[in-house]
Design a protein with these regions (language model features):
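Metal-dependent polysaccharide deacetylase catalytic core of the NodB/CE4 family, i.e.
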Residues: 2, 8-15, 23-178, 207
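Short, flexible, glycine/charge-rich loop motifs used to bind or transfer phosphoryl groups or to couple energy/partner
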Residues: 5-6, 191
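Substrate-binding cleft of secreted/luminal carbohydrate-active enzymes
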Residues: 158, 173-176, 187-210
Length: 210
């Protein structure tokens, strides 16, 4: 890593926008959240929501379509089409599709995986970055190394296989695998994640860096 200048048009400020847990977990059903992300009639990612009467509507029901709508009205907000970072766990599937191996007996399992992969590619094409949030929403700095490896392997098998390679991880719980100092090759967890292809290691934290 080497610090440098971020070149932007005058008056613009760089910041990182991220959303984790973009999975639409089962526990969220019936609580006013979107149920899943889909590809809209315009070819852009949007959200479905199930209403109390059982009907399904499509619209701006989460960050992705809300931000896309804002950028349509304020194109100067997005520099060269950049959007944000969306991070996924895997234990309940991704994007509202039950893609985890635990759902493999479901009659919609294969179609869910196909649809999730298509939506993930649509997000990439639309300027979004995709990232890991661990497979099981684990504290990656506190779990045993054995569980750390198991979690990362599950994420590779059940999520990476759908969204394609990513080099970004957003740690759950605002946790970290080190302290405030730079990672070194003496950090076994850093070495493992680096070997798995990760290059950007992010906390869930809105504070300025030190």
């Amino acid at each position: 890593f080497k610090e440098g200048d971020i070149m932007l048009p005058p008056g613009k400020k760089a910041f990182v926008l991220s959303q984790d847990d973009v999975c639409y977990y089962e526990y969220m059903d019936g609580d006013g959240f979107a149920s899943r992300m889909v590809i809209g009639e315009d070819g852009k990612p949007t959200c479905e929501m199930k209403l109390d009467d059982g009907s399904v509507v499509t619209g701006d029901y989460d960050l992705v379509p809300i931000l896309n709508r804002f950028i349509e009205e304020h194109p100067g907000f997005s520099y060269k089409g950049a959007k944000g970072v969306l991070a996924f766990t895997g234990y309940n599937g991704i994007l509202g599709y039950r893609t985890a191996a635990s759902y493999s007996e479901s009659p919609t399992y294969e179609s869910d995986r196909e649809m999730a992969a298509a939506v993930a590619q649509c997000l990439r094409d639309d300027g979004w970055e995709l990232a890991s949030h661990s497979w099981g929403h684990r504290n990656m700095g506190q779990i045993s190394m054995e569980n750390f490896i198991t979690d990362t392997t599950k994420w590779e098998n059940e999520v990476d296989s759908l969204i394609g390679p990513t080099d970004i991880i957003l740690y759950p719980f605002g946790a970290d695998i080190g302290d405030w100092r730079l990672y070194t090759t003496e950090n076994e967890r850093f070495n493992y994640l680096y070997a798995a292809g990760f290059r950007y290691f992010c906390n869930v934290d809105s504070n300025q860096y030190w």
